């Protein structure tokens, strides 16, 4: 049976709304929503080639990362992958903390005994912390749509670190500097300029004023030595 994309999109929307929103208990355990098929599926994160299934994958908010799926059809009938989804689970409780957007894709059909692969991009906007990422594939099989859940991957979501050379940060710094410079200029014109001009007027000498002249004063001769007085009298006599 061939499913159209609008039909698949309607099914995915109904599945997410019914399975996870209407039934709070469904968010604690998704095993009851999955169907056992002879269909092996695995995935990797290409930009993290050294991260294995038991390792911690680090991804960043605001950035897209790619999930590369690989699968093998071990059933005796054709299987078609028609949609992708998944969820981020709590590390301790297993409860779903955020769903990946369930999206229809152009059908990827795998005949019995054959393998295939495809990639899907995921964008993030989550609270920075550690999760268990569990991708899901929506499968068209035996005239029905079923859900196949992949393995979990420990994933730490982080905010993008801010660099001092980030263009947006540099622009913000330039705006702040220009703002402070403008405020300083205004403050100088309002208060500083008047203050410095007033100080200069106080210290400026008056025009035409004569410079101070040293004047002689009479000195009491009682404290002068007697020899010094005799010398002065002798000079006068001469």
Swiss-Prot record:
Listed name of the protein: Increased recombination centers protein 22
Keywords: Endoplasmic reticulum, Membrane, Signal, Transmembrane, Transmembrane helix
Record gene name: IRC22
Family: Belongs to the IRC22 family.
Residue ranges crossing the lipid bilayer per the database entry: 170-190
Membrane topology (Cytoplasmic): 191-238
PANTHER family (UniProt xref): TRANSLOCON-ASSOCIATED PROTEIN SUBUNIT ALPHA, TRANSLOCON-ASSOCIATED PROTEIN, ALPHA SUBUNIT
Topology of this chain in the membrane: Single-pass type I membrane protein
Function, as annotated: Is probably involved in a pathway contributing to genomic integrity.
Topological region Lumenal: 22-169
Statement: the UniProt record of this protein carries the keyword Cytoplasm: no
Keyword match Nucleotide-binding: no
Any Gene Ontology CC annotation: endoplasmic reticulum membrane
A Pfam family this chain is assigned to: TRAP_alpha
Subcellular compartments: Endoplasmic reticulum membrane
């Amino acid at each position: 049976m061939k499913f159209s994309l609008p039909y698949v999109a309607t099914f995915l929307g109904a599945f997410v709304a019914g399975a996870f929103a209407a039934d709070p208990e469904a968010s604690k355990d998704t095993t009851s929503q999955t169907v056992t098929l002879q269909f092996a599926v695995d995935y990797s994160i290409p930009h993290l080639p050294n991260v294995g299934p038991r390792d911690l994958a680090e991804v960043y908010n605001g950035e897209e990362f790619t999930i590369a799926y690989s699968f093998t059809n071990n059933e005796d009938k054709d299987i078609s992958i028609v949609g992708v989804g998944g969820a981020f689970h709590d590390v301790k409780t297993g409860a779903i903390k955020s769903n990946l957007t369930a999206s229809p894709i152009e059908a990827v059909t795998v005949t019995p005994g054959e393998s295939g692969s495809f990639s899907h991009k995921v964008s993030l906007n989550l609270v920075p912390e550690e999760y268990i990422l569990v991708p899901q594939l929506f499968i068209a099989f035996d005239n029905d749509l079923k859900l196949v859940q992949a393995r979990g991957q420990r994933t730490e979501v982080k905010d993008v670190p801010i660099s001092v050379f980030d263009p947006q940060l540099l622009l913000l710094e330039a705006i702040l500097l220009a703002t402070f410079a403008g405020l300083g200029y205004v403050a100088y014109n309002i208060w500083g300029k008047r203050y410095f001009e007033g100080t200069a007027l106080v210290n400026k000498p008056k025009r035409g004023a004569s410079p101070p002249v040293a004047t002689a004063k009479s000195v009491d001769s009682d404290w002068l030595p007697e020899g010094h007085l005799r010398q002065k009298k002798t000079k006068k006599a001469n």
